[in-house]
UniProtKB/Swiss-Prot annotation:
Record's compositionally biased regions (Polar residues): 283-299, 436-450
GO CC list: extracellular region; host cell plasma membrane; membrane
Quaternary structure (record): Interacts with intimin and host proteins.
Transmembrane segments annotated in the record for this chain: 234-254, 363-383
Membrane topology: Multi-pass membrane protein
Keywords linked to the UniProt accession: Host cell membrane, Host membrane, Membrane, Phosphoprotein, Receptor, Secreted, Transmembrane, Transmembrane helix, Virulence
Source species of the chain: Escherichia coli O111:H- (strain 11128 / EHEC)
Cytoplasmic side: 1-233, 384-551
Composition bias type Basic and acidic residues, residue spans: 422-435
Motif, Essential for actin pedestal formation: chain positions: 452-454
Extracellular-side segments: 255-362
Pfam families linked to this entry: Tir_receptor_C (PF07489), Tir_receptor_M (PF03549), Tir_receptor_N (PF07490)
UniProt xrefs under Gene3D superfamilies: Translocated intimin receptor, central domain
Protein name listed in UniProt: Translocated intimin receptor Tir
Length: 551
């Protein structure tokens, strides 16, 4: 018969709320303890919350009702304690204002805001609807005691280990704890490796009579490094190289089309040749013109006495022609010199302009493009080298085996049926110790598992010294006093009040008292009465300040 849904009790008209299951998830009461009647020697007033269950295991054993216990317990719906002892009786487990608040405003995050009338309300979201609940002074003080940053935002962290108790911690602590755990798991924050082929196997071997229990947990993890192509830095480097190549091409095209063309060699003229040519041309031209006029020629007289042109120019005419020819040659020489100078100047100007444009375009285009190519090449090379260096460390296959051996002595107690549940709970605690030692050995393994900080809370506050140390994965995280209290519920150190709630209370601790006590409900159960006391508050004190009821 599974433990958990007390709503199947036909005698309570389905008013009993569901109780959280024990870690074993099985009914151990039917093994060895179902045939023994649980006796209660207390007064009638201290047994008002007890009622025999009809149609249960107790009916098959003994149909008698214990004297003084009501057959139809109408008070069960409003009682404040509940535990399931499947030998035929039910007791409500402890529920305080924090549990009620959790039920009213939803089981997620909530905030505290001051209302217009000066009161404070807890505002949460339940079923998609915003719900607010007015807090009394004790509840407000208890929440403010753990909210050191005074941010007014909290998170419910209840249901620890099957205890069923609502617990509250500041939302900032949850965010900080998550960030620190992620930083511990991935200190370099590469995000490039992905674990694959994870195979986790757990084998449990136990006996109902309380013999040796052995729990073997084998974890095989094979992780491989991702390809360098999945690294964004590699593609950034490739993009830089491509941009550099494009810049080189654009610079070359610009220089070929948009720049000043290269000037041709300047055309020069020899001044002497120009002067000689001009002088000869001028002399010939003037000589021809002089011969046209007979007066410019010499005259010879024949025998008869007639004047006949001799065909020679007069000396003064020849002298004038020679003078004018020299002047023309000198002018041609000067013109040739000036023409050569102008051509050279044009060439020099165009060449200088082209060189300036080339230097400017080369400095900007080629230099920047070359820098991009070199930088991209270096980045791609470094990224590839880092991936190759990290790849052997990540391509590891680790096999971790946890073995826990626990000695349980059998006994014929009245509540022997709960022994299996206690054994499963203690086994989970010892498994935590073995995982602590294994984690310290494989601290550098990327496949190390993180133990849920809210997983195992059934141990008492004054447990053995071997359980006081934290898991290795929280060594650095626990250095922060604000966060270490979230994990550490063992030892003699006082909790500083960063986490509100009582992890040791509820169905686990009370069930342990019932099953480990040969007298059943006889001893140590002062809290399971109709008066205001609570056994769980007697067994484990609340670790946080504030009112005792608001836990």
């Amino acid at each position: 018969m599974p433990i958990g849904n007390l709503g199947n009790n036909v005698n309570s008209n389905n008013l009993i709320p569901p109780a959280p299951p024990l870690p074993s998830q099985t009914d151990g009461a039917s093994r060895g303890g179902a045939g023994q009647l649980i006796n209660s020697t207390g007064a009638l007033g201290s047994r008002l919350l007890f009622s025999p269950l009809r149609n249960s295991i107790a009916d098959s054993v003994d149909s008698r009702d214990i004297p003084g216990l009501p057959v139809h317990p109408s008070r069960l719906a409003t009682a404040t304690s509940e535990i399931c002892l499947l030998g035929g009786f039910e007791v409500l487990h402890d529920k305080g204002p924090l549990d009620t608040l959790n039920k009213q405003i939803g089981a997620s995050a909530f905030r505290i805001e001051q209302q217009s009338d000066g009161s404070y309300a807890a505002i949460g979201e339940k079923n998609g609807v915003e719900v607010s609940v007015i807090l009394n002074s004790q509840e407000l003080q208890s929440l403010q005691a753990i909210d050191i940053e005074d941010k007014g935002r909290f998170v419910f962290t209840g249901g620890r280990g099957g205890g069923g108790h609502s617990m509250v911690t500041p939302a900032s602590d949850i965010a900080e704890a998550r960030a620190k755990i992620l930083a511990k798991l991935d200190p370099n924050n590469h995000g490039g490796s992905q674990a694959r082929n994870v195979d986790t196997r757990s084998v449990g071997v136990g006996s109902a009579s309380g013999m040796d229990d052995s729990v073997v947990s084998e974890t095989r993890t094979s992780s491989t490094a991702s390809s360098v192509r999945s690294d964004p830095k590699f593609w950034v480097s490739i993009g830089a190289i491509a941009a550099g190549l494009a810049g080189l091409a654009a610079t070359g095209i610009t220089q070929a089309l948009a720049l000043t063309p290269e000037p041709d060699d300047p055309t020069t003229t020899d001044p002497e040749q120009a002067a000689s040519a001009a002088e000869s041309a001028t002399r010939d031209q003037l000589t021809q013109e002089a011969f046209k006029n007979p007066e410019n020629q010499k005259v010879s007289i024949d025998e008869i006495g007639n004047s006949i042109p001799s065909g020679e120019l007069k000396d003064d005419v020849v002298a004038k022609i020679e003078e004018q020819a020299k002047e023309a040659g000198e002018a041609a020489r000067q013109q040739a010199v000036e023409s050569n100078a102008q051509a050279q100047q044009r060439y020099d100007t165009q060449y200088a302009r082209r060189q300036e444009e080339l230097e400017l375009s080369s400095g900007i285009g080629y230099s920047l493009s070359s820098a991009l190519i070199v930088g991209g090449g270096i980045g791609a090379g470094v990224t590839t080298a880092l991936h190759r260096r990290n790849q052997p460390a990540e391509q590891t296959t680790t096999t971790t085996t946890h073995t826990v051996v626990q000695q349980q002595t059998g006994g014929n107690t009245p509540a022997q049926g709960g022994t299996d549940a206690i054994r499963a709970e203690d086994t989970s605690l010892n498994r935590r110790d073995s995982q602590r030692s294994t984690a310290s050995t494989h601290w550098s393994d990327t496949s190390s598992a993180v133990v849920n900080p809210y997983a195992e809370v059934g141990e008492a506050r004054n447990s053995s010294p071997a359980r006081q140390a934290e898991e290795h994965i929280y060594d650095e995280v626990a250095a922060d006093p604000n966060y270490s209290v979230i994990q550490n519920f063992s030892g003699n150190n006082q909790v500083t009040g960063r986490l509100m709630g009582t992890p040791g209370q509820g169905i686990q601790s009370t069930y342990a008292i019932l099953t480990n006590n040969s007298a059943g409900l006889r001893l140590g159960m002062g809290g399971l009465t109709g008066s205001g006391g609570s056994a769980v508050n007697t067994a484990n004190a609340a670790p946080t300040p504030g009112p005792g009821r608001f836990v």
